[in-house]
């Protein structure tokens, strides 16, 4: 006859039960601590949000000629910065080495620049593609960022939902510098992501900053406004915090 050589076989049953209860109690205690930290983190996030949300960074006044138009566009919960492809300030085709990509439709005159979670961009072309795993990683992780560039035209925009800005040469150059620095570069070339499920009108680049709930797509747009000396918020994880600054 074979006997079990395990530890519990030599311990009375009531002792085994007590040890199991102790293990369960320790496990529940650890789970409770995790949940407490989780809810404390969420509470802290919204406390900081409500503290900073009302404050506005005012537009810096200037006597310079305001010759460049910049448009902020809402895209669902997301925001983009719309700029002309060609201007006296920059030729984006040459600057990002995408002249061939832009030949897909020469009637389109502008580019939409947006920042976001790289995995979310590439895995979620449509909201129907969103999975719980992708959503969880986006909300609770610190993930690689990406810059989405979309070929488009202002004539297709709903003008009732946009913010139109006028920038000087100096302010425009600061915004351009910000956008270019938001892209990761290797050997003087932007790191373009060629394997994506979008159309020929869409381009993606690796971003120089990681994405998290502390630095979202709307935080990126808001930083662009700050850099170019426009009215902005202190922290804007949600698009409403940007657009509320421009309500009449």
Regions found by a protein language model. Give the residues of each.
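Short hydrophobic transmembrane-like helices used for membrane targeting/insertion
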Residues: 1, 11-20
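Second-shell loop/turn segments in exported
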Residues: 158-168, 206-212
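Activation targets extended, charge/polar-rich intrinsically disordered C-terminal tails
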Residues: 16, 21-54, 58, 181-248
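Alpha-helical transmembrane signal-anchor/signal-peptide segments
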Residues: 52-69, 75
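Internal catalytic-core helix/loop-beta-alpha segment
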Residues: 162-182
């Amino acid at each position: 006859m074979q006997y079990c050589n395990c530890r519990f076989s030599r311990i009375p049953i009531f002792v085994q039960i007590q040890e199991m209860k102790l293990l369960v109690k320790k496990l529940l205690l650890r789970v409770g601590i995790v949940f407490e930290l989780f809810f404390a983190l969420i509470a802290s996030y919204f406390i900081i949000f409500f503290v900073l949300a009302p404050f506005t960074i005012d537009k810096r006044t200037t006597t310079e000629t305001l010759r460049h138009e910049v448009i902020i566009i809402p895209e669902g919960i997301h925001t983009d910065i719309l700029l002309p492809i060609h201007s006296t300030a920059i030729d984006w085709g040459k600057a990002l080495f995408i002249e061939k990509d832009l030949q897909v439709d020469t009637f389109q005159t502008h580019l939409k620049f947006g920042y976001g979670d790289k995995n979310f961009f590439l895995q979620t072309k449509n909201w129907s593609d969103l999975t719980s795993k992708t959503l969880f990683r986006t909300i609770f992780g610190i993930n690689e960022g990406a810059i989405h560039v979309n070929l488009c035209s202002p004539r297709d925009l709903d003008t009732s939902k946009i913010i139109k800005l006028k920038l000087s040469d100096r302010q425009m150059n600061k915004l351009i510098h910000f956008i270019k620095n938001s892209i990761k570069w290797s050997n003087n070339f932007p790191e373009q992501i060629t394997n994506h499920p979008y159309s020929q009108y869409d381009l993606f680049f690796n971003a120089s900053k990681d994405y998290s709930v502390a630095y979202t797509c709307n935080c990126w747009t808001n930083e662009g406004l700050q850099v170019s000396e426009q009215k902005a918020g202190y922290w804007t994880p949600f698009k409403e915090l940007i657009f509320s600054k421009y309500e009449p």
